[in-house]
UniProtKB/Swiss-Prot annotation:
UniProt organism field: Caenorhabditis elegans
Name of the protein in its database record: Molybdenum cofactor biosynthesis protein moc-5
Keywords assigned by UniProt, alphabetized: 4Fe-4S, GTP-binding, Iron, Iron-sulfur, Lyase, Metal-binding, Molybdenum cofactor biosynthesis, Nucleotide-binding, S-adenosyl-L-methionine
Enzyme Commission no: 4.1.99.22, 4.6.1.17
Assembly behavior: Isoform a and isoform b probably form a heterooligomer.
Length: 600
């Protein structure tokens, strides 16, 4: 080897090593992406949630939509149409996709009603998507209606830009605050190949027009290997003297786009290309809360760039997004198949309260992460909501435990039901209260210490809710068979769920001084801790009446656990029911909420 050749090889190795080292530093996860969404102590979390809910309920009047992982959903994406005037390679086949009839699509008024409903629950950001949203003829009126909805702070649109010039001035005047334009190549021929349409000039003119209207315009670039990855640096160069935020999007699988791993290029590989060009001039920026983008910029450049890394490094921990399809289906995860039709509910005459319950139920079923990244490998999107990965069967209102945290005292008037027990506790604490001063606190005991039923005829009728929790400790074998649904008697959790409903209906026949109640709703959900051989149960009861449903919730929970015992006792009697307690009650004179049994 000549001296000159050896010198070149040394220089190349040093550059490569330097690039790898820079990329390694640049891809260290930021705290908001590397850590779970909740990093507070339990006490801090309870206080933060209580204050946040108080703030939102004070201004909006409705509790926010929290999922079972305490992610608050404040961002709504609405697809306005299935139609598109492009046929992008990564999005749909050349012949397009089958379209639903127009009467199956959400109307203008239905869209605005849903926006108003979500805004009442704390959603403050709405983005309009498609298909191509600018195809919709009433797009300007929709933007105007959304922007004028109380509580909505941002209205954005994601568009391919083909006809944007025609509408942009009107959209801005109507209240459009954010704009994302999709453009996957800066080469006209390649652009036409990737979109199967000749529209580069119109799209570029739309970008330039938008730059004059908005302080920052986002460009969405889906990067495909062997297609446009060689343009990554060219797109970054656009940010030198332009107010652009270029977002490189990893190719994702979804219906109709014929996803192939051969076309996939991860963000670290893209970042390598940029660092090879700019070296340590690449700067990592801080990401905003709930941001989907890992943000960067080149030192001295006006704009910035980033990566949406749904495939290689998910951002599910901070996901605050919900989606409504053009035909009115609610999706809590882009990668999930689970949907619920809000359109059908609206057209059947559901009230806003009923719609809110449907939405909360769907949000409760949102998984910790989208299916593509379970167990560290790529998998098919979830087919069933009864998912052992989460250990949760479908839930309805368990998260209401978290969205009704009170600021009032945790005193519970039915905690002690025995006069003797109450007085013995008083002696332990050296108090000097008389029996008569104590028994008036016990609503089922008169001044002489005799049992009585409470007269509820003068109480106001209101919606009463109660939630109870309990646990059954299992053997490892029973736990395994429940998870695999191989118990000989049948589906344990389904039978226990039904039994809990039947049990709640029998409370007045079982507890002597309880009033018969017309229940509006009873539901039980299970959280199976397979590793520790525990099955946790949460039961919710609700009624519209003049007395509470705490006993119904507690009975439902207890009966559910007893049913599990009965279904499994042929395997082993070594099971124990434990920690059955009231978690939450609301709707009456007092509200009561507790996070765990240690607070009792």
């Amino acid at each position: 080897m000549s001296c000159r050749a050896g010198k070149k090889l040394f220089q190349w190795s040093r550059v490569k090593s330097s690039t790898e080292e820079i990329v390694k530093q640049l891809t260290v996860p930021l705290r908001e992406h590397a850590e779970p969404i909740l990093t507070l102590t339990p006490e801090q979390k309870r206080e933060a949630v209580r204050l946040k809910i108080q703030e939102i309920e004070h201004t909006k009047g409705q509790p926010p939509f929290f999922d079972m992982f305490m992610r608050e959903h404040t961002y709504l994406r609405i697809s306005l149409t299935e139609k598109c005037n492009f046929r992008c390679l990564y999005c749909m086949p050349a012949e397009g996709v089958p379209l639903k009839p127009k009467d199956k699509m959400l109307s203008n008024s239905e869209v605005l009603r849903l926006v108003k409903l979500f805004a009442a629950h704390g959603v403050d950001k709405v983005r309009l998507t498609g298909g191509e949203p600018t195809i919709r003829k009433d797009i300007v009126h929709i933007v105007e209606g959304i922007s004028s909805t109380p509580g909505i702070k941002e209205v954005g649109i994601t568009t391919n830009g083909l006809v944007l010039q025609r509408f942009l001035p009107q959209l801005r005047d109507a209240g459009l605050t954010k704009i994302n334009i999709s453009i996957d190549s800066l080469d006209r021929e390649k652009f036409a190949k990737m979109t199967r349409r000749d529209g580069f000039d119109k799209v570029w003119k739309a970008i330039e027009l938008a730059r004059g209207y908005y302080p920052k315009v986002k460009l969405n670039v889906v990067v495909l290997k062997h297609q446009n990855e060689n343009e990554v640096v060219d797109f970054v160069n656009l940010t030198k003297d332009r107010n652009l935020d270029v977002r490189f999007i990893e190719f994702m699988p979804f219906g109709g786009n014929e996803f192939k791993n051969d076309n996939f290029i991860g963000y670290r590989e893209m970042l390598n290309l940029i660092v090879d060009k700019y070296g340590d001039g690449v700067i990592r920026l801080s990401d905003s809360p709930n941001d989907t983008t890992k943000a960067y910029k080149i030192d001295g450049f006006q704009g910035q760039f980033g990566f949406i890394t749904s495939m290689s490094d998910h951002f599910c921990n901070t996901c605050n997004r919900l989606r409504i399809t053009a035909d009115g289906n609610l999706k809590v995860c882009l990668h999930g198949n689970s949907e619920v039709s809000l359109r059908d509910r609206i057209r059947c005459g559901d009230s806003d309260e009923q719609l809110s319950e449907v939405i909360q139920k769907a949000v409760n079923n949102k998984k910790a992460r989208h299916a593509v990244f379970r167990n560290g490998r790529s998998e098919e999107p979830a087919k069933s909501s009864n998912d052992s990965y989460r250990g949760l069967t479908p839930v309805t209102s368990a998260s209401s435990i978290l969205v009704h945290l009170p600021s009032s005292s945790l005193y519970h008037s039915h905690l002690h039901s025995s006069r003797h027990f109450f007085i013995s506790q008083i002696r332990c604490f050296s108090t000097t209260y008389s029996v008569s001063s104590i028994t008036h606190l016990l609503t089922h005991v008169d001044n002489n210490g005799n049992a009585k039923q409470v007269d509820v005829s003068q109480k106001d009728t209101s919606t009463r809710t109660a939630v109870a929790r309990g646990t059954i400790i299992l053997t490892a074998e029973i736990s395994r068979q429940i998870s695999e649904n191989t118990i000989k008697k049948g589906d344990v959790l389904t039978v226990a769920k039904i039994a809990s409903i039947l049990g709640a209906k029998q409370v007045a026949n079982l507890i002597p001084l309880c009033h018969p109640i017309r229940l509006d709703f009873v539901d039980t959900v299970f959280n199976h801790d397979i590793e520790n051989s525990k099955l946790h149960c949460i039961s919710t009861a609700r009624c519209s009446g003049n007395t509470g449903v705490e006993m119904e919730a507690l009975t439902a929970c207890t009966i559910a656990l007893l049913t599990v015992y009965d279904m499994c006792k042929a395997i082993s009697q070594k099971m124990m029911l434990t920690n059955i307690y009231l978690v939450h009650k609301s709707g009456g004179k007092t509200t009561y909420t507790i996070d765990n049994e240690n607070q009792i």
